[in-house]
UniProtKB/Swiss-Prot annotation:
Zn(2+) binds at residues 366, 370, 390. It comes from Streptomyces mobaraensis. The keyword Signal applies. Residues 1-33 form the signal peptide. PANTHER family: BACILLOLYSIN. This is Transglutaminase-activating metalloprotease. Its cofactor is Zn(2+).
Length: 760
């Protein structure tokens, strides 16, 4: 079996009662505040409701655990179905279940017992376990010549420490001995060491620098930071309800209704857990810095809102989806102007800044989202994936801030607008035009992965704004925005709620550790297609938002016609060519063509060009397709008709059926030429098939010599084969019967060899 595209699943999430108490010193609203709609409406652009079946189920921890057990029980069979090597093993990381029955299982991989960095993948399957599609961080076959390193671990550690010290760490050695891994995130997989060096970065943030070193050559292959940094808003926001627990005669800042999330006071320390906040009367803080509990309430409340947002909007029960809460630490260091998420402690940490602690709604949402990203796609915190990691936290922080609907801190597309980090009242980041901060980028360019992740996040933040609200000037919630596009064309927004759902689905069900901007576009279009339909208004507007930041093309708003490429035929030999087109509206398409070679015509209803060319020469052909709304699309190509017998082109246009998971079939061409074949024999192949990854394709010479033109690929779910292959046929005689041999090796689909051609 191999992946066969389809969809999702159902369960119910248990809702728990909220034990809340009144606290003084932070925002005015309930933790269960609804979506901001009346106060801060998004412009009515093109906002549609998603397909509820494609949305995730609210799984309880026990339901999620059962799905993970099921995945573990079948992971060996899954690995076999995916065609993994004998030394490759799957490790279940997470399972997401959609309301229509599809299961999305996220795996990591090992090779001969070693972790494979960049080997993660997501497999979509039916409720019964039938694999449908899969998305992999790497398409390379995982294999290394040996798992015995040439380089000593001590040498790798020495180089890693040197790299960390160059970034401000004072550490003299690694946190622990380097571990052997297979590095597969970029290029050909190699045996490597991963070394983690601790210490403190230049700004006081803890460091966990991961350095990847080639275990044979000693070359540094990659490095990334394990501690994710972020920012937030003011602590002064009115009264709120927070979740606490009574213990004896006092109360603890321990929210047992949200996985036991606790908030601690570091009291200006920089290590350890700190002291759990307690209070005698369950009234916390006084709204100023004079009471350490004020910052604690802000952080606790922000974590509470973020938990509720993920659960109520996206069906995720906690950061890892297992119902277990993280914890928060406030008053880190002395005047530390930042906040961070740390996987090693499963916690958020907040500094006091320059008199304004970084402990409010959007900073909590930003940091907690780093945890969600780590538990799902685990976007590597470096290069383009690192920028996407940061942008994910900014997007979800913005979504949470709007969802909270707090009048003291209304939602906006500004990051850090109240902490005054710049000292002049300006925000830290702008989503409508990121370059306004002086460092972030508005659009993708080839060098984007080489800058700081907080600035390479700019284009993705810009995409989120454009996808949510659209381009151009507008006022939202009292804030003026004016969002440009890199191609100068307008973008229509799909609504903030829809944009957030699309990104979250892409993050949790499609993206992998090394996803770049192109991969993020692909993932969000997949998610938009699942939720709203491929070629829907929402799908096309999501694509246009990506085009507006220089990632991918604009979506067609009319008819899209696939170019068949230039054609070559033989005079007096029957041919056929199927033109493929899609429209953005329902209804039939109408086909017409100009410039066809004499003897050929096009079927106006089906788009099939057929006939027998009667005259040699080259024609310029244009095919035009019209939909029921009168919109048109076209494609142009050349069609050359050659003479037959002893010529350079030989073709077979007789269709041959390809049975599903059956025996190989062949299509012959009789070549009448003297001498041997050329060193660059061209083989043009046109096959109709709904899942081309099923197919192996071989060319067989008259003497039996065989060339493999195409291997099967369980991950290649695209339809049809229309390719030109080149082989060195200089060692075989050209004269005789050549064969195209095709076999469907996986069950689920069948197809047809439409035609193939040899050009000598």
């Amino acid at each position: 079996m191999r992946p066969t595209p389809q969809r999702r699943a159902v369960a119910t999430g248990a809702l728990v009662a909220v034990t809340a108490m009144l606290a003084v010193g932070v925002q005015t609203t309930s933790a269960n505040a609804g979506q901001d709609k009346a106060a801060h409406p998004a412009p009515r652009q093109s906002i549609h409701k998603p397909d509820p079946g494609a949305e995730p189920v609210k799984l309880t921890p026990s339901q999620r655990a059962e799905l993970i057990r099921d995945a573990n029980a079948t992971k060996a069979e899954t690995a076999k179905n995916l065609g993994l090597g004998a030394k490759e093993k799957l490790v279940v990381k997470d399972v997401v279940k959609d309301k229509n029955g599809t299961l999305h299982t996220r795996y990591e991989r090992t090779y001969d017992g070693l972790p494979v960095l960049g080997g993660d993948l997501v497999v979509d399957a039916t409720r019964s376990g039938q694999v449908k599609t899969a998305a992999k961080a790497t398409k390379q076959r995982i294999a290394v010549a040996s798992t015995t390193p040439s380089l000593a671990a001590s040498a790798a550690e020495k180089d890693a420490v040197k790299a960390a010290r160059a970034k401000g760490s004072k550490a003299g050695k690694a946190d622990k001995a380097p571990r052997k891994v297979v590095w597969a995130a970029k290029g050909t997989p190699v045996l490597a060491y991963e070394t983690v060096v601790g210490g403190v970065q230049d700004d006081g943030t803890p460091s966990q620098l991961h350095v990847i070193t080639d275990a044979k050559t000693g070359k540094k292959l990659f490095e990334f930071q394990g501690v994710k940094q972020g920012t937030g808003n003011s602590q002064h926001s009115g009264q709120v309800q927070i979740g606490t627990t009574k213990s004896g005669s006092s109360y603890q800042m321990n929210d047992t209704t949200r996985g036991g999330h606790k908030t601690y006071n570091l009291n200006h320390g920089s290590s350890g857990t700190g002291t759990l906040f307690t209070d005698s009367d369950d009234v916390w803080g006084n709204g100023t810095n004079s009471d350490p509990a004020t910052a604690g309430v802000d952080a606790h409340y922000g974590a509470q809102l973020t938990w509720d947002y993920y659960k109520n909007v996206h069906g995720r029960n906690g950061i890892r989806g297992d119902g277990v809460g993280a914890y928060s630490r406030v008053h880190y260091g002395n005047n530390y102007v930042n906040a961070f998420w740390d996987d090693s402690c499963f916690c958020m940490t907040y500094g006091d800044g320059n008199g304004i602690p970084l402990t409010s709604i959007d900073v909590a949402a930003h940091e907690m989202t780093h945890g969600v990203t780590s538990a799902t796609a685990n976007l590597t915190y470096s290069g383009e994936s690192g920028g996407l990691n940061e942008a994910t936290s900014d997007m979800m922080a913005t979504a949470v801030e709007f969802w909270a609907n707090n009048p003291a801190d209304p939602g906006d597309y500004l990051i850090g607008e109240k902490i005054n980090i710049n000292g002049d009242g300006t925000p830290l980041r702008y989503m409508d035009k990121p370059s306004k901060d002086g460092a972030s980028k508005d659009a993708w360019y080839s060098g984007l992965g080489g800058i700081d992740v907080h600035y390479s996040s700019g284009p993705a933040n810009h995409w989120f704004y454009l996808a949510s609200e659209g381009s151009g000037p507008k006022d939202i919630g009292g804030v003026h925005y004016d969002s440009p596009t890199s191609d100068g064309l307008p973008v229509t927004g799909v609504g903030r709620d829809n944009a957030a759902k699309i990104w979250f689905k892409a993050l949790t069900e499609r993206m992998q550790s090394n996803t770049d901007y192109k991969g993020a576009r692909d993932a969000t279009l997949w998610a938009a297609g699942e939720l709203f339909g491929v070629n829907s208004d929402t799908y096309n507007n999501v694509a246009n938002a990506w085009a507006a930041i220089n990632v991918g093309p604009r979506a067609s708003s009319g008819v899209s016609v696939t170019s068949p490429g230039d054609q070559t035929s033989i005079v007096n030999q029957a041919v056929s060519l199927q033109i493929k087109a899609t429209g953005s509206t329902s209804g039939a398409l109408t086909y017409s063509a100009t410039g066809l070679p004499a003897g050929l015509s096009i079927n106006a209803s089906t788009g099939l060009i057929s006939g027998t060319p009667t005259t040699t020469g080259t024609s310029n052909v244009t095919v035009t397709v019209k939909d029921s709304a009168g919109k048109t699309g076209s494609t142009s190509f050349k069609w050359t008709v050659n003479t037959t017998g002893g010529g350079s082109v030989f073709e077979n246009t007789t269709q041959v059926a390809i049975p599903d998971a059956g025996a190989a079939v062949t299509s012959p061409i009789v070549v009448t030429r003297s001498g041997n074949g050329p060193s660059a024999l061209k083989v043009d192949v046109n096959i109709t098939h709904t899942y081309r990854g099923d197919l192996t394709i071989d060319l067989v010479a008259p003497n039996g010599k065989t060339w493999r033109l195409k291997n099967s690929d369980a991950w290649d779910s695209a339809a049809d084969v229309s390719e030109t292959y080149t082989v060195d046929a200089s060692s075989v005689s050209a004269n005789g019967t050549w064969k195209l041999k095709v076999q469907d090796v996986y069950s689920g689909d069948s197809g047809t060899i439409d035609k193939w051609r040899l050009t000598f």
